[in-house]
Amino acid sequence: MLSPRKVKFRKWQKGRLRGMATRGATVSFGDIGLKAVEHGKLSSQQIEAARIAMMRHIKRGGKVWIRIFPDHPVTAKPLETRQGSGKGAPVGWCAPVKPGRVLYEIKGVSLELAKEALTRAAHKLPIKTTIVVREGL
């Protein structure tokens, strides 16, 4: 699972996801990519599950880029605990995603194989996505 090595604060505020993604909105490294269509938070487990689904489909060919990183801590209170008495302990990491953000990119395999691999990855994610092809291909 992906997680940051060091953070300035153990617990963050939740924040809000508003507007479109301004950075990371174009296919930069690969030939074809998976782009988010709606807001959401992807956990490190979901990011890894989608990556494994892609890699199993394309087997040994091609290269995959993960364009997001889970750097936002997620906290939770223990089960059967009353409310109050502070914020819960950190339990994992998530990546806030805005619409228009490219999540994964693939290069080095045929377009049909890459589309199928990205479709399998999209089934593992909790947000709506679309497949985009790099300009000029």
Swiss-Prot record:
This is Large ribosomal subunit protein uL16. GO terms for cellular component: cytosolic large ribosomal subunit. Keywords: Ribonucleoprotein, Ribosomal protein, RNA-binding, rRNA-binding, tRNA-binding. The keyword Hydrolase does not apply. One of its GO terms (biological process) is translation. CDD domains: Ribosomal_L16_L10e. Pfam families: Ribosomal_L16 (PF00252). Signal peptide: none annotated. GO terms for molecular function: rRNA binding; structural constituent of ribosome; tRNA binding. Belongs to the universal ribosomal protein uL16 family. The keyword RNA-binding applies. Gene3D superfamilies: Ribosomal protein L10e/L16. It comes from the Bacteria. Disulfide bonds: none annotated. Part of the 50S ribosomal subunit. Binds 23S rRNA and is also seen to make contacts with the A and possibly P site tRNAs. InterPro entries: Ribosomal_uL16, Ribosomal_uL16_bact-type, Ribosomal_uL16_CS, Ribosomal_uL16_dom, Ribosomal_uL16_sf.
